[in-house]
Amino acid sequence: MLLLLALVSVALAHASEEHFDGNRVYRVSVHGEDHVNLIQELANTKEIDFWKPDSATQVKPLTTVDFHVKAEDVADVENFLEENEVHYEVLISNVRNALESQFDSHTRASGHSYTKYNKWETIEAWIQQVATDNPDLVTQSVIGTTFEGRNMYVLKIGKTRPNKPAIFIDCGFHAREWISPAFCQWFVREAVRTYNQEIHMKQLLDELDFYVLPVVNIDGYVYTWTKDRMWRKTRSTMAGSSCLGVRPNRNFNAGWCEVGASRSPCSETYCGPAPESEKETKALADFIRNNLSTIKAYLTIHSYSQMMLYPYSYDYKLPENYEELNALVKGAAKELATLHGTKYTYGPGATTIYPAAGGSDDWSYDQGIKYSFTFELRDTGFFGFLLPESQIRQTCEETMLAVKYIANYVREHLY
């Protein structure tokens, strides 16, 4: 079957109402509380899209802050920083150019590709196809629907056997983190492709099941392709507010809305009106609750920062098995680096990246899943959320090593 080809520029014309031409992404060095106050002042006077950390309230001394500024505010922001002697560098000088550079060719096939970013419709068709093509290893089920009525699919990967221990992996919590769903697709492909070729994969799939949720926030993901590439929240409506969406990784009942989250519907860190208020988070949580007897590990895949995190993020307390979790991610990070030399940092969420309540990894850990981790994939900020397709293969290859390392440890340390 011949694949239809379309110009990337045409696709991009439909991908966003905001063209981002002239927009910039900055990295600011925060030395002390005076700099923290200046960043918060800037956020109060200009429309700042924080990339890392998630909001002005999470800025702290002796860190760096990455944020995205609209073209009309660039001059004012740079003048403000210079007048206050705040050091900054421009990570992306024109966001529009970076958007176009995500795609590694001027033409793209309409079919599915593991080394391209795929639209939701393409991913959905792939889900059906991969289950049809691999009936001995893959089954698909619908665990719920999104706010806009799209089916949420989970793929169960493993050799059929009753009551097998399982590992749950989800991708695409935040809509603009396109590399995340790309990894879930890659994981499924490699699992079925290497089952009869690699003894370690065969052992994993014979002894464990893997539940893979390729895209959690489907509505938001679709919106990044059709309207606004920088969207991150869900697309639900709120009574009494014109602002849409909830930050899904602030919507779980784990220190809900206590820190690193907002009760304002217009905030990018809005925690929602209640825990699990979002159809997407409720469906995910219900599935895990219904399978708690078998799920032994939980991995949620995000970007960016090159980090492996474990609980807690909503509190500075350490988990009971802190030493075990730290040793495990240390080994996984070392394994990941063997392929392309990519360096990951690791540790508890609150101290390693920033405090944030309502996360799915903290929630799953508190449900009794003692191997619960968040991956923050490539890169460390040069491309940020706009990682080029040319890096998909390497990112997924190295992440696969880390995930298999953790999975094998879980297989050997069942509880």
Curated annotation (Swiss-Prot):
PROSITE patterns: CARBOXYPEPT_ZN_1, CARBOXYPEPT_ZN_2, PEPTIDASE_M14
Disulfide bonds listed in the record: C171-C184, C243-C266, C257-C271
Cofactor (UniProt): Zn(2+)
Binding site for Zn(2+): H174, E177, H302
GO biological process terms held by the UniProt record: proteolysis
Catalytic activity: Preferential release of a C-terminal lysine or arginine amino acid
Cofactor binding note: Binds 1 zinc ion per subunit.
Assigned keywords, A-Z: Carboxypeptidase, Cytoplasmic vesicle, Disulfide bond, Hydrolase, Metal-binding, Metalloprotease, Protease, Secreted, Signal, Zinc, Zymogen
Residues that, per the record, bind substrate: H174, A175, R176, E177, R232, N249, R250, S303, Y304, Y354
One Pfam match: Peptidase_M14
EC number(s) given by UniProt: 3.4.17.2
Secretion signal, residue range per the UniProt entry: 1-13
GO cellular component assignments: cytoplasmic vesicle; extracellular space
Prodomain positions: 14-108
Record carries keyword Hydrolase: yes
GO MF annotation: an example: metallocarboxypeptidase activity
Protein's UniProt keywords contain Nuclease: no
Gene3D superfamilies: Metallocarboxypeptidase-like, Zn peptidases
Protein name according to UniProt: Carboxypeptidase B
Primary gene name: Cpb1
